[in-house]
Each structure stands twice: as C-alpha cells, then as structure tokens.
C-alpha cells in the first residue's frame, strides 16, 4: 500500500473541508508568526536608541541601572573626568526624559532627548531635514510626525516652550515617540543648567576603561547591560499576554488539524476498513493519519506565510508604531510549530484507525 498518495486522495475528496482546514491552520500559524514578529519588533525598537549611539560604555547617576530614570542627574563637569581617563576615545552628554505633549488636543507620550550638536546621542537616520543645531529646534520621529500631521517648519510645544521641527527621523521608538533637541535646550526646559543624566563613552577597551572609571567612583554600565535593561523594562508588561495568545493560537491549530483529519477518517471508515482487511497493519494506518496531518500542516504553513505577509503589511499601514520583525529563528519556530501541530493532531485519528474493525468494510456506510 502506498500511503502518501492515499493520504492525498482522501484529503482532496472534500475540497471545501480541506480549504477550511488550511485557512484555519494558516490563520493560527499567521497569528503565531505575527505575535512572534511583534515581540522581536518590541525588542528591536526598545534597543534602537542604545544601538544608534555607538557608545561602548554609559556613565549614569549613582544607583541608576537604566536610561533616563526620573529625578536622576550628573554634573556635566563629570565629562572632564571621563574624557581625561586613559583609553577613552570620546565622551558625550545626553539627557532624556519622558514627557506628555498636547498635540491638537491629543496627548502623546514621547521621550525627549537632548544632545550636543555634532556629537553622538542625538537624532540619527534622518529621513528628511537635519538634526537640531539651535536651542529652539527639534527633530521628531516619522510616526509622531505622520500621526499628528507635523512637518518640517511646524512648531512643537513642549511645556511652556515652542520649538521648530527641522528634521524627521526614519525610525521610531516603541509606544512612545522621539523628540530630539539640543542638550542646552533640555537643561533650560528643566531649569537644570550644568546637569545631564547620562554620559556616552566611546572606547576600544571597554573592560579596562570601565574599571578605571569605576575606580573614580562613577557608575558605569556597558552597552549590552543597558540594552538588556531597556528591553526588560519595555517587554515585561507584554511578555505574559503574548505568550498566552501564542499558546491559544497553537492549541487552535492543533484542534483544527485534528478535527479536519478525524472527520475525514470518520466519513471514510469503510474505505479504511477495506485497506485494513487486505492486510494493512495498525502501524501503517497510523502512519496514514500522520501523513494526512503533515500534508495539511504543510499546506497551512504555506497559507500562514502568505497571511503573515498580508497581516504584517496591514499592521504597518494601520499602526506604524508597531514593527513586525521576521527573523530566521522565527521562521524556524513556525516550521517547528506546524510539525508539532501535525504530530499532536495525528494522535486521535491514528488511534481511531488503529482500533478500526476490518469488518467495517462489509457493513456499508
């Protein structure tokens, strides 16, 4: 008996059921891929500013383990200490704070970042315009600009001050927009002259320089530590809900495959009875059930890939602040999920076929 052709024939015997099963599995796999892509996107967006600075080390206020913690500051005179440390190639101050803007009677959460013009820590990957050079200028991210209808030359109110938009960046942050200003502008806005809340350090000897800076009483983190902390802060709220939704989608996919194949087995039990009556073993019939679930899962995987591409495009159009990042690892996980779905879904129909009475072939339907 050639079980694979028979598996194909039995699946194709009910095209509408096959199509419904493929679409259902595809939707489940699409949801798994979309949620996984959102998770990767959250991590990528969370770490984007840290990665863009090019810093190897970060000098932070005492007791601080993350960027832009409220109420933390360093004297800008710390810059002289850092720059005078052997092994430091460059050092630049940056000041960030979370703010709520009122844009056309709509509140928008943003991260206001202040940096010294021409030094690292400011706007990067500009799509239009330039980085702010004067204290009354800002650059904003593309999502914030598009959502609130802001363009080059427009005015942006932050607290009691007004700034002119001179640049729009290509990238955006996660859930919050970016507004880039000069460091001095942020100092004036906060009424904190001569202060900063982070110093970026460029060096080719991060371990040695970190030890030297720490020996001077400074709090120093390397970029992997800062990146990890930022990602943890942004993802801890979403981790459990996303995992739950992935689990639900996976269970739904298993049930769809199992029900589709089981219904086909139940309806064609007489044909399977004939196959068993002519000598097919229970193991071979179980393999037939597995072959059918594998074919169905493979078709669902293809459909899920197409649906994922469409869903990703639609989400990017409707909600550009949410990025869906598809990685090779995510693709491997999707294939693995489809395979596990097929294996689990084959259990019930395989048991039904294993216990099928060959006499069914002679009893009619």
Label for each model-derived stretch:
Residues 1-30, 43, 48, 360:
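N-terminal Sec/SRP start-transfer signal
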Residues 11, 265, 274-283, 356, ...:
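Short helix-to-coil transition segments within interhelical loops
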Residues 26, 30-109, 208-213:
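Hydrophobic, regular-secondary-structure patches
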Residues 85, 157-164, 168-243, 248-249:
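Mechanotransmission and gating elements of multispan inner-membrane complexes involved in transport
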Residues 94-97, 103-116, 125-185, 192-194:
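Hydrophobic secondary-structure segments that place a key small or acidic residue at a functional site
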Residues 212-255, 263-269, 274-275, 283, ...:
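Peri-transmembrane interface segments
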Residues 273-316, 333-337, 341:
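Transmembrane alpha-helical interface segments in multi-pass membrane proteins
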Residues 327-365:
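C-terminal membrane-exit region of the final transmembrane helix in multipass inner-membrane proteins
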């Amino acid at each position: 008996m050639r079980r694979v052709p028979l598996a194909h024939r039995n699946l194709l015997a009910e095209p509408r059921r096959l199509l419904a099963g493929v679409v259902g599995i595809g939707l489940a796999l699409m949801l798994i891929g979309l949620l996984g892509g959102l998770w990767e996107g959250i991590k990528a967006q969370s770490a984007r500013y840290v990665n863009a600075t090019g810093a190897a080390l970060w000098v932070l206020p005492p007791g601080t383990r993350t960027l832009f913690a409220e109420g933390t500051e360093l004297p800008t005179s710390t810059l002289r200490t850092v720059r005078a440390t052997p092994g430091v190639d460059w050092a630049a101050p940056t000041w960030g704070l979370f703010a709520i803007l009122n844009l056309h009677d709509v509140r928008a959460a943003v991260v206001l970042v202040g940096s010294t013009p021409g030094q690292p820590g400011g706007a990067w990957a500009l799509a239009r315009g330039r980085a702010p050079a004067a204290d009354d200028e800002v650059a904003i991210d593309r999502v914030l600009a598009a959502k609130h209808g802001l363009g080059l030359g427009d005015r942006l109110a932050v607290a009691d001050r007004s700034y002119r938009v001179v640049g729009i960046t290509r990238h955006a942050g996660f859930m919050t927009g970016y507004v880039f200003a000069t460091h001095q502008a942020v100092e004036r806005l906060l009424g904190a002259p001569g202060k900063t809340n982070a110093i970026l350090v460029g060096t080719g000897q991060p371990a040695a320089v970190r030890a030297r800076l720490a020996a001077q009483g400074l709090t120093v983190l390397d970029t992997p530590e800062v990146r990890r902390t930022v990602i943890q802060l942004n993802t801890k709220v979403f981790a459990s809900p996303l995992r739950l939704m992935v689990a639900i989608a996976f269970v739904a996919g298993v049930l769809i495959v199992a029900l589709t194949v089981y219904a086909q087995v139940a309806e064609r039990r007489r044909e399977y009875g004939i196959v068993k009556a002519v000598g097919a073993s229970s193991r071979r019939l179980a393999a037939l059930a597995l072959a059918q679930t594998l074919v169905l899962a493979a078709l669902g995987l293809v459909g899920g890939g197409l649906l994922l591409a469409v869903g990703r495009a639609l989400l990017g159009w409707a909600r550009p602040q949410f990025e869906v990042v598809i990685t090779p690892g995510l693709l491997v996980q999707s294939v693995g999920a489809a395979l596990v779905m097929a294996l689990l879904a084959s259990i019930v129909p395989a048991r039904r076929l294993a216990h099928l009475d060959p006499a069914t072939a002679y009893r009619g339907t």
